[in-house]
Amino acid sequence: VTQDKTWVAEMYPKLVAYHDWWLRNRDHNGNGVPEYGATRDKAHNTESGEMLFTVKKSDKEETQSGLNNYARVVEKGQYDSLEIPAQVAASWESGRDDAAVFGFIDKEQLDKYVANGGKRSDWTVKFAENRSQDGTLLGYSLLQESVDQASYMYSDNHYLAEMATILGKPEEAKRYRQLAQQLADYINTCMFDPTTQFYYDVRIEDKPLANGCAGKPIVERGKGPEGWSPLFNGAATQANADAVVKVMLDPKEFNTFVPLGTAALTNPAFGADIYWRGRVWVDQFWFGLKGMERYGYRDDALKLADTFFRHAKGLTADGPIQENYNPLTGAQQGAPNFSWS
């Protein structure tokens, strides 16, 4: 290590700008906890800035625009499905395309969920416009605060504090440490569900709850790898981490033939061959192992790693490493020679 501050000095303002972009463009309620969303784009909105969506019923479909129209359509419920480019963009922005937490579920799964007493509205996403001070549309936020995004923002603040300290900016370092602590407190107070013992995204309500949370955890959409992001980033309390690891090691949840898939077996949207709703992605698997190790579960993490290498088809042979793997059979899925993996 050269201890050369030049590179740190060059990168620091760029990383500060990136940090601030999220708070300016994806923090609709201004509480410091960003959401995922969509930029202003012809694929997402009309020229006048109204969000696009397509209503599908039977063999008919109609493209409409505007958040007010969207709210009316959702309230009436007279549709088979909705196609919303901004919803897709938000999931892509997270890196977890079509994940259950963003409201994605197959029709047959949703029908079963409703038949078992659930509500279709549990899987309906809502949006808000984000605008600059002069009223210019910047883009859209899902009206839910994502626990993985909050956890990464926690890490961002820690790293910025370290860089500010190196560069002799003590006040800025202090500010970023405070922001990190505020995020950790929020994650553990608002995003952990004591009943199911797991972390979830939070649905943003019209008014904050009495405890300062924007809303309640979205437990209905099931458990996913976002739930161990507070462990990977070090934002979790030890007690909450203990509970999450117990879920991760449960054969009825994530501890499958190939463990730590992108949806728990109990998730209503789970499918062993569904993109980001069951398949095992190596990056999310690794995040889980590192989070376990960080909170004192190294031996358990090593056992899961051993299971992965033994059961993921072709992984220890001469073939290419796959994009993802079937959690129940270990079958190769997705693209070969995938860079993340």
Which sequence ranges carry the predicted segments?
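Extracytoplasmic mature domains of secreted/periplasmic and thylakoid-lumen proteins
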Residues: 11-38
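Aromatic sugar-binding interfaces of carbohydrate-active proteins
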Residues: 8-11, 15, 22, 304, ...
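An acidic- and aromatic-residue-enriched active-site/binding cleft used to recognize and process polar
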Residues: 27-28, 37-39, 169, 192, ...
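Extended glycan-interaction surfaces of carbohydrate-active proteins
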Residues: 33-145, 185-280, 313-341
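A structural signal for well-ordered alpha-helices, especially hydrophobic packing surfaces
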Residues: 19-22, 164, 184-187
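Residues that flank catalytic or metal-binding motifs in active/ligand-binding sites
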Residues: 11, 149, 226-227
